[in-house]
Amino acid sequence: MTTPLADFLRTYAASGMARLHMPGHKGRGPLGCEAWDLTEISGADSLYEAAGVIARSEENAAALFGSAATFYSTEGSTQCVKAMLFLALQNRPAGTPPVVLAARNVHKSFVHAAALLDFEPLWLWPEEGTSSLCACPVAAEGLDRALSALDAPPAAVYITSPDYLGNMADIPAPVSYTHLTL
């Protein structure tokens, strides 16, 4: 597998070219990685309109992950969570309220998205006997109860996996149930 983005950065960093562009550190600094810190300059591609080295790198990542597509983002997973919820809310049936069912151990970016996008999170509480809010396994039965209590389908069901303790959720069960029910 090729490494188009890393290859470009390595070549640019070694070129000795005058950096008359952002960022202001000009490729120098105490960490040693600043030479690889670039903005959208000629050849570096654009994160939001990838057509060159970033696009090829994303294609490689998708092949590695076995996914149909992979997109890099800024802000870590925070921006991805916000974008995902925005799209889910845009695709909900007309006239349905902006509701998202969510396990109680969501990242704070989910809560920020709820405020920014003006939707109401309805919490999926952990099953009896769960000793921590960091571990919030969502069983199909709990999801069934939550869905049954709604007047209309939610825009999305949001489950954090792995959780903050490293536990993996049984994603296939609630996904299968949700697809059958909604």
Region locations from a protein language model:
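N-terminal "arm"/small-domain region of PLP-dependent enzymes with the aminotransferase-like
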Residues: M1-G52
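Substrate-binding/gating loop at the entrance of the active-site cleft, primarily
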Residues: A102-F119
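Conserved N-terminal alpha-helix of the aminotransferase class I/II PLP-enzyme fold
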Residues: E34-Q79
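PLP-dependent aminotransferase-class I/II
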Residues: F119-A173
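Gly/Ser/Thr-rich loops at beta-strand to alpha-helix junctions
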Residues: I54, E75-C80, V106-K108, D163-N167
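Conserved small/polar residues in nucleotide/adenosyl-binding loops
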Residues: Y177-L182
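Conserved beta-loop-alpha segment that forms the PLP phosphate-binding cup at the N-terminus of a helix
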Residues: A69-G95, S109-A113
